[in-house]
């Protein structure tokens, strides 16, 4: 298992967002140990989401003998990619750079992104993307697909976005809304959203409620 901890992220930490094979501890460990490197510096913090990017398979991996996961920035609303946030050190960052082919032509490169953890916090993190000049698709192998799918399940994250990327099925959307206060069912302003929404039930969310002002 990954070294998974529950703690506040230190401001000086290097954070990394993984969304593909690096979600899998065994796969990461095998890659490192084959090269005589220490895999222990990839410390999983927990599940996370990257907003505004769509999972795709437009990169062919010779080592995987099929398509490899990539991220494509999109202007579409309600698009995000699930994955995990990790804390890493400089040594592990160098390992990730080597694994992803940074500084090698037509391989993955670092990108700074904003990801959101399950508590709603935002974090600046490094991830790796490949800039493809063509709209192409490479079928991933079943084993590679399973690496991602099994770890999304482990992280209790949905696999809808993975299914879309593989099968070109309809793009999942965030079409649920949590409301509180006067927009709730039976309250004074609920009629403003009633015609456009179907009530599914009551729920709770972790957070703090503030009195801002009258408006």
Locate predicted features.
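A glycine-rich, hydrophobic/aromatic-adjacent loop/helix-cap motif
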Residues: 2-215
